[in-house]
């Protein structure tokens, strides 16, 4: 029989991105969709966004982070991963909740793309008006 491995799950969302995050005790490796985080995300700012919850609670080298993320663009995916990591950390240690909540990492950002309306070019952009 296999030894039960301790792991913590968290689901993060942002815009149309959904990230399923798994925290496993380890040395701080972050894997996104079976690729190293450095290969998946090119921009340093996005990598920094992902690491924020772990840095806030000083657990960067305590967990390996395994992520499966779908939908949206790179920025939305990075913020969804941040949300998922924060939720998983709370499952790992409930005492971290106030710290992460204060930083805003546990709050789901409700802003979504506004739908396009008929008669307009975009959600709010009207066609050009001509007096004559």
Swiss-Prot record:
Keywords in alphabetical order: Ribonucleoprotein, Ribosomal protein
Gene Ontology CC terms: cytosolic small ribosomal subunit
InterPro entries per UniProt: Ribosomal_Su5_D2-typ_SF, Ribosomal_uS9, Ribosomal_uS9_bac/plastid, Ribosomal_uS9_CS, Ribsml_uS5_D2-typ_fold_subgr
Region described as Disordered: 104-132
Highest taxon of source: Bacteria
Any single biological process term in GO: translation
Compositional bias segments (type: Basic residues): 113-132
Single Gene Ontology MF annotation: structural constituent of ribosome
Keyword match Ribonucleoprotein: yes
Family classification: Belongs to the universal ribosomal protein uS9 family.
HAMAP family the UniProt entry points to: Ribosomal_uS9_B
Annotated NCBIfam families: PRK00132.1
Protein name, entry field: Small ribosomal subunit protein uS9
Organism: Natranaerobius thermophilus (strain ATCC BAA-1301 / DSM 18059 / JW/NM-WN-LF)
Taxonomic classification: Bacteria, Bacillati, Bacillota, Clostridia, Natranaerobiales
Protein encoded by which gene: rpsI
């Amino acid at each position: 029989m296999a030894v039960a491995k301790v792991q913590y799950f968290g689901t993060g969302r942002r815009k149309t991105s959904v990230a399923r995050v798994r925290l496993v005790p380890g040395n701080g490796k972050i894997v996104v969709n079976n690729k190293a985080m450095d290969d998946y995300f090119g921009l340093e700012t996005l990598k920094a966004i992902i690491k924020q919850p772990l840095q806030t609670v000083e657990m960067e080298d305590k967990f390996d982070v395994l992520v499966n993320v779908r939908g949206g663009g790179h920025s939305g995916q990075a913020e969804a991963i941040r949300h998922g990591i924060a939720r998983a950390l709370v499952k790992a240690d409930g005492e971290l909740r106030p710290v992460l909540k204060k930083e805003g990492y546990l709050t789901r950002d409700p802003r979504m793309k506004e739908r396009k309306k008929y008669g307009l070019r975009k959600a709010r952009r009207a066609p050009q008006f001509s007096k004559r």
